[in-house]
Amino acid sequence: MNWHMIISGLIVVVLKVVGMTLFLLYFPQIFNKSNDGFTTTRSYGTVSQIFGSSSPSPNGFITTRSYGTVCPKDWEFYQARCFFLSTSESSWNESRDFCKGKGSTLAIVNTPEKLKFLQDITDAEKYFIGLIYHREEKRWRWINNSVFNGNVTNQNQNFNCATIGLTKTFDAASCDISYRRICEKNAK
């Protein structure tokens, strides 16, 4: 039997498999156009979510590429959710309607990890989120009606909406003043 022919054949097969793998990985980056308006986006997750380990990374996030899950163009991907950070400003009600028009809601920031992720990408701007004060109950609720158990700073009698961004906290704000907004929806 001619062993060098078999080894040469195996090397060719391995090179073809490696070449095909690289082609499939980088082809979407070369031709980033799509007919449905979706594109691959950055993905953030804890180390344990990505690698199955129990120890988080030092900053709590690790950047990966997500090829199986997509968000619309200009939306950010995090933990199977898509987030849109607007550059325009409007009142809380207009912001809620804007998000609804995009098939989403104002962001429900109900975990410390989600808050950190959003604060890391909001820069030095204030953004409305889906948190509103119910005077009759004297408590804050998310727009999905779940109870907010955290603290809101800068509370004032006329401040019934909440923002995040400038500080590392939830800040009460007037619902009538114009701020940017964060919309949230499921990734596809």
Swiss-Prot record:
Topology Extracellular: residue spans: 28-188
One Gene Ontology term of the molecular function aspect: carbohydrate binding
Start and end residues of each C-type lectin domain: 78-184
Matching Gene3D superfamilies: Mannose-Binding Protein A, subunit A (3.10.100.10)
Glycosylation: residue positions: N32, N93, N144, N151
Entry annotated with the keyword Disulfide bond: yes
InterPro entries per UniProt: C-type_lectin-like, C-type_lectin-like/link_sf, CLEC5A, CTDL_fold, NKR-like_CTLD
GO biological process terms held by the UniProt record: cellular defense response; innate immune response; myeloid cell differentiation; negative regulation of apoptotic process; negative regulation of myeloid cell apoptotic process; osteoblast development; positive regulation of cytokine production; signal transduction
Keywords per UniProt: Cell membrane, Disulfide bond, Glycoprotein, Host cell receptor for virus entry, Host-virus interaction, Immunity, Innate immunity, Lectin, Membrane, Receptor, Signal-anchor, Transmembrane, Transmembrane helix
Disulphides: C71-C82, C99-C183, C161-C175
TM region positions: 5-27
PTM comment text: N-glycosylated. Contains sialic acid residues.
Keyword Membrane recorded: yes
Coiled coil segments of this chain: none
Tissue expression per record: Highly expressed in bone marrow with lower levels in synovium, lung and bronchus. Expressed in peripheral blood monocytes and in the monocyte/macrophage cell lines U-937 and Mono-Mac-6, but not in cell lines of other origins. Expression is down-regulated when monocytes differentiate into dendritic cells.
Membrane topology per record: Single-pass type II membrane protein
Residue ranges, Cytoplasmic side: 1-4
Location in the cell: Cell membrane
One GO cellular component term noted in the UniProt record for this chain: specific granule membrane
Remarks, miscellaneous: Acts as a key regulator of synovial injury and bone erosion during autoimmune joint inflammation when its activation leads to enhanced recruitment of inflammatory macrophages and neutrophils to the joints.
Subunit structure: Monomer. Homodimer. The majority of CLEC5A is expressed as a monomeric form on macrophages. Interacts with TYROBP/DAP12. The interaction with TYROBP is required for CLEC5A cell surface expression. Interacts with HCST/DAP10. Forms a CLEC5A/TYROBP/HCST trimolecular complex depending almost solely on TYROBP.
Function of the molecule: Functions as a positive regulator of osteoclastogenesis. Cell surface receptor that signals via TYROBP. Regulates inflammatory responses.
Protein name (record): C-type lectin domain family 5 member A
Record organism: Homo sapiens (Human)
Gene this chain is encoded by: CLEC5A
